[in-house]
Curated annotation (Swiss-Prot):
This is Aspartate 1-decarboxylase. It comes from the Bacteria. It comes from Pseudothermotoga lettingae (strain ATCC BAA-301 / DSM 14385 / NBRC 107922 / TMO). It catalyses: L-aspartate + H(+) = beta-alanine + CO2. The modification Pyruvic acid (Ser) is found at S24. Binds 1 pyruvoyl group covalently per subunit.
Length: 115
């Protein structure tokens, strides 16, 4: 069994942040579905602007909204407009892994390429 990349939103743009919320990353539900992210799933975030890497969990955002909002303590690690990578990993048996679901996004969090 191996720990492999399962889902990735590449170049997502932070649309909002809320330090006073209990935590999480709110992601447009349509984007979640495209890369197979589930509510409350653990994700690793890498901020391309400042190099920060941290973990949080996913909550659903309004479908079609383009929302990428960091909440709670994680909100202190990003700024609106930062470009981030959202990654989720899974444990797979040899032979069952077919690669990650990857969506590359533009500055409005619209999908420009699927891998």
């Amino acid at each position: 069994m191996r720990f492999m990349l399962k889902s990735k939103l590449h170049m997502a743009c932070v649309t909002d942040k809320n330090i006073n919320y209990e935590g999480s990353i709110e992601i447009d539900e349509e984007l979640m579905n495209i890369v197979d992210l589930k509510e409350n799933e653990l994700v690793l975030i890498a901020d391309l602007n400042n190099g920060q890497r941290f973990e949080t969990y996913v909550i659903k955002g309004k479908p079609g909204s383009g929302t990428i909002s960091l909440n709670g303590a994680a909100a202190r690690l990003v700024e609106k407009g930062d470009r981030i990578i959202v990654m989720s990993f899974g444990i797979f048996n040899d032979g069952e892994y077919s690669g990650p679901k990857v969506a590359i996004l533009n500055e409005k969090n619209q999908v420009i390429h699927l891998k």
